[in-house]
């Protein structure tokens, strides 16, 4: 581990030199590449340097104990050694986590797709609850959220809502929301007070850059149509809505949220690019040895990941067996406890795999 950390430290210093080289500064591609490489390793290098400083202090303090010290001085040095030993252990644990394989998509912005699934009106109302939950969570994280496409119902639910989330680490946290979310509650329309079970699905796609997904114009069929409101009635006499079909994959994306056809096409392209990128990622993931996969499901969208039980005010994440009696707070966007628990669990699994 320490050989690897030392080579990272040396590479970091070399990147410092390269980033001040006029030849690199004049080459925007190299400048971007080296800047990203340095940014990716910065935290690891800084923690490693802190660890080396603590180790030096620890060794010096241990050597002091070998000198003839009075009782008071001996006690002070012993206390310092204990504190440094604790810091050393904490930094070692942190370095182990920092050296774990990183998801290359973690720093990306995301496209989130929420759909009402089994349960009719109630599933669509729950899809709206999930959208509000993510919007509040994004706001608390300082991320920007933008609706790309929404198919709303007369009761205020969503058959489907697609939105982008832009901000530092958006994918690294929201990727754990991939899957089927189940709700158990008494619907507002239920006169007998019976609890119904409904489901909404969530897909979280890393937003792809143009350079990552090469889409040729000849591979896209563009259809335009008049946008419609809840229930399907036409609300726009101009042909501003856009449907894009990617012919090689059969992926179809529609957008009618904007009044401008150009803006709708831009938004639809963003979703199309993300879906194509995600398709390739899913195919590549399927080829991996099953034993290398994380135990925390972040890929299978048919997997039931969480249950929201309203009568008992309980939320259970089935992947790690976490149950919280905080349903109202979670629906208000307070997802940190769940997501942090999933991250810690995944890190533990990755460490176990590395040891094996």
UniProtKB/Swiss-Prot annotation:
Keywords: Cytoplasm, Methylation, Protein biosynthesis. Methylated by PrmC. Methylation increases the termination efficiency of RF1. InterPro entries: PCRF, Pep_chain_release_fac_I, Pep_chain_release_fac_I_sf, Prokaryotic/Mito_RF, RF-1. It is found in: Cytoplasm. The modification N5-methylglutamine is found at residue 233. GO terms for molecular function: translation release factor activity, codon specific. It comes from the Bacteria. Its main location: cytoplasm. Peptide chain release factor 1 directs the termination of translation in response to the peptide chain termination codons UAG and UAA. Belongs to the prokaryotic/mitochondrial release factor family. This is Peptide chain release factor 1. The lineage of its organism: Bacteria, Bacillati, Bacillota, Bacilli, Bacillales. The gene is prfA.
């Amino acid at each position: 581990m320490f050989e690897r950390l030392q080579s990272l430290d040396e590479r970091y210093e070399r990147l410092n030199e390269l980033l001040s080289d006029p030849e690199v500064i004049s080459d925007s591609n190299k400048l971007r590449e080296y800047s990203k490489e340095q940014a990716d390793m910065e935290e690891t290098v800084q923690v490693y340097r802190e660890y080396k400083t603590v180790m030096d202090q620890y060794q010096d303090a241990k050597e002091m104990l070998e000198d003839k010290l009075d009782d008071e001085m001996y006690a002070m040095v012993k206390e310092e050694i204990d504190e440094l030993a604790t810091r050393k252990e904490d930094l070692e644990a942190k370095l182990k986590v920092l050296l774990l394989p990183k998801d290359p998509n973690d720093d990306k912005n995301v496209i989130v797709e929420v759909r009402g699934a089994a349960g009719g009106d109630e599933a669509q109302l729950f899809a709206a609850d999930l959208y509000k939950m993510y919007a509040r969570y994004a706001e608390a994280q300082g991320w920007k959220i933008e609706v790309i496409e929404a198919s709303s119902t007369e009761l205020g639910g969503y058959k489907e809502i697609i939105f982008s989330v832009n901000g530092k680490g958006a994918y690294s946290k929201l990727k754990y929301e991939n899957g089927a979310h189940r709700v158990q509650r008494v619907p507002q329309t239920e006169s007998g007070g019976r609890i119904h079970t409904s489901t909404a699905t969530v897909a979280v796609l890393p937003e792809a850059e143009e350079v990552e997904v090469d889409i040729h114009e000849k591979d896209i069929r563009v259809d335009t149509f008049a946008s419609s409101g809840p229930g399907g009635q036409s609300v726009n006499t101009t042909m501003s809505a856009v449907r894009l079909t990617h012919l090689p994959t059969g992926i179809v994306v529609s957008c009618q949220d904007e009044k401008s056809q150009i803006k709708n096409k831009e938004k639809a392209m963003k979703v199309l690019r993300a879906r194509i990128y995600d398709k390739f990622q899913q195919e590549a993931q399927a080829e991996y040895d099953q034993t290398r996969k994380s135990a925390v499901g972040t890929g299978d969208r048919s997997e039931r990941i969480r249950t929201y039980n309203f009568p008992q005010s309980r939320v259970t994440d089935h992947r790690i067996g976490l149950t919280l009696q905080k349903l109202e707070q979670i629906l208000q966007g307070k997802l940190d406890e769940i997501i942090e628990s999933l991250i810690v669990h995944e890190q533990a699994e990755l460490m176990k795999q590395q040891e094996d």
